[in-house]
């Protein structure tokens, strides 16, 4: 893994990147191919993202043509259902020193050491705390727990891995003994085992975390994911992808694994029988050609594995990130770019049935609009530890089944509760007196929150 620089030069995607959004293709030809279902090329995707490289800026009429084509494709592939899952987010720790410039989630790992004197807003949970959080949410009716965390230096795959790290004399492993920290995060396997309660679906361990879980060893990703699977892992979130083009990763996340290693880890997860999701975090320093290359790499991975259940475009939220604070970006993607991202993803990824609209990223109004641009999934309830506390408080990002039913039916679509892998589905009656989950292991239709 490369060292994280203190500063990174500000690239102008139109002048300094090797990959530029220029093609020998025409917008009209790309749109025609999209409409008739011909597999698109990278150049086709660039033309659709830009609404024509022969134009300066996004052409509104052309954009609407792309959105219409994507919405028709969505209807052909998945119909008028809009799915969502009853889920919980339980992130183990915010401690991380990877230094990604787009991130405002992490806290410097040294702040968590037992000799650190100043207050900080981060957290690390013990396995027993994670288990209690999941147990409470399971009793409320959730189907899935999603857990994605910072790369805490004390985290190891299991006790064998910890012993290897403890005895290693290498100084490049990003490892410190848990004895040095106020709270011991235990191991990845211990955390997963703790969260593996009552047949809940456990969605965790990104490729970046899998790398962290094998550092200092010659273990394959297959070995790592097999051990995680034995601890209870059911599926893998395809986050940490950001943009799968190394010249972009060199700018926004130079401390993260490279594109090839991300793809290797995902293929390994699929090879041991784990389903996975896929993502793209866009709207920062990258250009349309990078976005198209990213989509091609996701599509190629799906051609090889068939294990990707959904694609999730994640619009960059720039506030309070180093990219923004250092003047490397002046904002995120525009609304037009967001809509075209959903649409082109639908048209390009002909082997991924489900495209998700993130209401957390887009907001409710624009999130619903994305469901007319090619998306068919509307995330999940995102119950969290803070929400499960009985005594008041801010419910934050939680979304109830009643809210889902009201919003989805308002745009003329059918609300459907789903499982993580989309194999289990339940059409929801928006006129029912009480709306709650029924697919979770302990769900009985009671609302998640009273």
From Swiss-Prot:
Note describing how the cofactor binds: Binds 1 [4Fe-4S] cluster. The cluster is coordinated with 3 cysteines and an exchangeable S-adenosyl-L-methionine.
Keyword vocabulary terms for this entry: 4Fe-4S, Iron, Iron-sulfur, Metal-binding, S-adenosyl-L-methionine, Transferase
Pfam family, one: CofH_C
UniProt key word Ion transport: no
InterPro entries: Aldolase_TIM, CofH/MnqC-like_C, CofH_family, F420, FO_synthase_su2, rSAM
Needed cofactors: [4Fe-4S] cluster
Pathway in which this enzyme or protein is active: Cofactor biosynthesis; coenzyme F0 biosynthesis
Region (Disordered): 1-24, 430-450
Lineage top rank: taxon: Archaea
Gene Ontology MF: a single term: 7,8-didemethyl-8-hydroxy-5-deazariboflavin synthase activity
Family matches, as Gene3D superfamilies: Aldolase class I (3.20.20.70)
PROSITE patterns, A to Z: RADICAL_SAM
Domain Radical SAM core, first and last residues per copy: 82-350
Enzyme Commission number, as recorded: 2.5.1.147
Residues the record lists as binding [4Fe-4S] cluster: 96, 100, 103
Enzyme class: transferase
Reaction(s) catalysed by this chain's protein: 5-amino-6-(D-ribitylamino)uracil + L-tyrosine + S-adenosyl-L-methionine = 5-amino-5-(4-hydroxybenzyl)-6-(D-ribitylimino)-5,6-dihydrouracil + 2-iminoacetate + 5'-deoxyadenosine + L-methionine + H(+)
Subunit structure: Consists of two subunits, CofG and CofH.
Entries under PANTHER family matching the protein: FO SYNTHASE (COFH), LIPOYL SYNTHASE 2
Family the entry assigns: Belongs to the radical SAM superfamily. CofH family.
Biological role: Catalyzes the radical-mediated synthesis of 5-amino-5-(4-hydroxybenzyl)-6-(D-ribitylimino)-5,6-dihydrouracil from 5-amino-6-(D-ribitylamino)uracil and L-tyrosine.
Name of the protein: 5-amino-6-(D-ribitylamino)uracil--L-tyrosine 4-hydroxyphenyl transferase
Lineage: Archaea, Methanobacteriati, Methanobacteriota, Stenosarchaea group, Halobacteria
């Amino acid at each position: 893994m490369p060292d994280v620089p203190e500063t990174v030069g500000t690239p102008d995607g139109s002048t300094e990147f090797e990959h530029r959004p220029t093609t020998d293709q025409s917008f009209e030809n790309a749109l025609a191919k999209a409409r008739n279902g011909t597999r698109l090329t990278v150049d086709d995707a660039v033309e659709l993202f830009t609404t024509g490289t022969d134009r300066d800026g996004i052409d509104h009429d052309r954009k609407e043509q792309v959105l219409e084509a994507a919405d028709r494709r969505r209807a052909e592939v998945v119909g008028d259902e809009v799915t969502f899952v009853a889920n919980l987010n339980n992130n183990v720790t915010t401690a991380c020193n990877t230094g990604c410039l787009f991130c405002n989630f992490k806290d410097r790992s040294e702040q968590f050491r037992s000799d650190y004197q100043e207050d900080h807003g981060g957290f690390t949970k013990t396995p027993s705390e994670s288990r209690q959080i999941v147990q409470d949410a399971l009793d409320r009716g959730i189907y899935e727990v999603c857990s994605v965390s910072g790369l805490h230096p004390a985290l190891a795959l299991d006790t064998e891995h910890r012993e290897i790290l403890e005895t290693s004399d290498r100084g490049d492993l990003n490892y410190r003994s848990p004895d040095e920290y106020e709270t011991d995060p235990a191991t990845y396997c211990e955390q997963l085992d703790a969260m593996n309660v009552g047949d809940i679906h456990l969605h965790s361990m990104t490729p970046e975390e899998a790398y962290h879980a094998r550092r200092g060893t010659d273990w394959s990703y297959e070995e790592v994911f097999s051990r995680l699977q034995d601890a209870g892992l059911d599926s893998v979130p395809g986050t940490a992808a950001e943009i799968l083009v190394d010249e972009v990763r060199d700018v926004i996340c130079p401390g993260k694994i490279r594109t090839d290693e991300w793809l290797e880890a995902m293929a390994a997860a699929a090879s041991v029988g784990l389903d996975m999701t896929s993502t793209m975090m866009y709207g920062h320093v990258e250009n349309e050609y990078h976005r198209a290359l990213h989509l091609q790499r996701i599509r190629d991975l799906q051609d090889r594995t068939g294990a990707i259940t959904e694609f999730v475009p994640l619009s960059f939220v720039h506030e309070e990130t180093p990219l923004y604070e250092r003047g490397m970006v002046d904002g995120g993607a525009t609304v037009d770019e967001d809509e075209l991202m959903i649409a082109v993803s639908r048209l390009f990824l002909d082997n991924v049935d489900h495209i998700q609209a993130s209401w957390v990223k887009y907001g409710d109004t624009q999130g619903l609009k994305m469901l007319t641009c090619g998306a068919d999934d509307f995330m999940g309830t995102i119950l969290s530890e803070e929400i499960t506390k009985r005594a008041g408080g801010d419910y934050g990002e939680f979304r109830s089944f009643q809210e889902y039913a009201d919003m989805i039916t308002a745009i003329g679509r059918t609300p459907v509760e789903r499982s993580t892998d989309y194999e289990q589905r339940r059409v929801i009656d928006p006129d029912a007196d009480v709306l709650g989950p029924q697919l979770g292991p302990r769900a009985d239709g009671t609302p998640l929150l009273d």
